[in-house]
From Swiss-Prot:
Gene, per the UniProt record: LY6G5B
Cysteines engaged in disulfide bonds, as pairs: 28-55, 31-40, 47-73, 81-98, 99-104
Post-translational modification as stated in the protein's UniProt record: N-glycosylated.
Record flagged with keyword Signal: yes
Protein name (Swiss-Prot/TrEMBL): Lymphocyte antigen 6 complex locus protein G5b
Superkingdom assignment: Eukaryota
Length: 201
């Protein structure tokens, strides 16, 4: 009887000592804007969150074609895992997917792991009209502090960091402003390094 008790105690001690500590943080791929045909346009870094949170991929579709992808560290207060949602425009909809391992929200293919060089004279063209740009990002529930625009003009005296450009093409400087909006909206936990340095446009 004593031998069985001793063996039981040793087994319990072995299980206790042999447990591998669970990391307190999870590391995910981060890309603020990814075009499947080009790669990661802005971001191409990593972000970290608590191990109880999940990595997330938000795929934005135009009809049935993948148009943009956002990768980052998801928060429960934002998009729900496996959620599909339409935007205000019937052609655009998105799906949110989550996973629970380090770097599980991987790139579409190996060549997409590095960001593109930032050109000085070529803007990023989006398939949206001037009037749709502000509504599209609002439709994605990003809680952007956008003012009311009249006749396609921007009121004087507004801080450029709290407005989105209504031009058809977005420069990389404007993508950085969009990054700030996303970072404050609760959509994703985004890294600070490497994205906020001013760049001439």
């Amino acid at each position: 009887m004593k031998v069985h008790m001793l063996v039981g105690v040793l087994v319990m001690v072995g299980f206790t000592v042999g447990k591998v500590p669970v990391p307190d943080i999870r590391t995910c791929h981060f890309c603020l804007v990814e075009d499947p045909s080009v790669g990661c346009i802005s971001g191409s870094e990593k972000c970290t969150i608590s191990s109880s949170s999940l990595c997330m991929v938000i795929t934005i579709y135009y009809d049935v074609k993948v148009r943009f992808i956002v990768r980052g560290c998801g928060q429960y207060i934002s998009y729900r895992c496996q959620e599909k949602r339409n935007t205000y425009f019937a052609e655009y909809w998105y799906q949110a997917q989550c996973c629970q391992y380090d770097y599980c929200n991987s790139w579409s293919s190996p060549q997409l792991q590095s960001s593109l060089p930032e050109p000085h004279d070529r803007p990023l063209a989006l398939p949206l009209s001037d009037s749709q740009i502000q509504w599209f990002y609002q439709a994605l529930n990003l809680s952007l502090p956008l003012p009311n625009f009249h006749a396609g003009t921007e009121p004087d005296g507004l801080d450029p960091m709290v407005t989105l450009s209504l031009n058809l093409g977005l420069s990389f400087a404007e993508l950085r402003r969009m990054y700030l909006f996303l970072n404050s909206s609760g959509l994703l936990v985004l890294p600070q390094a490497g994205l906020l340095t001013p760049h001439p446009s």
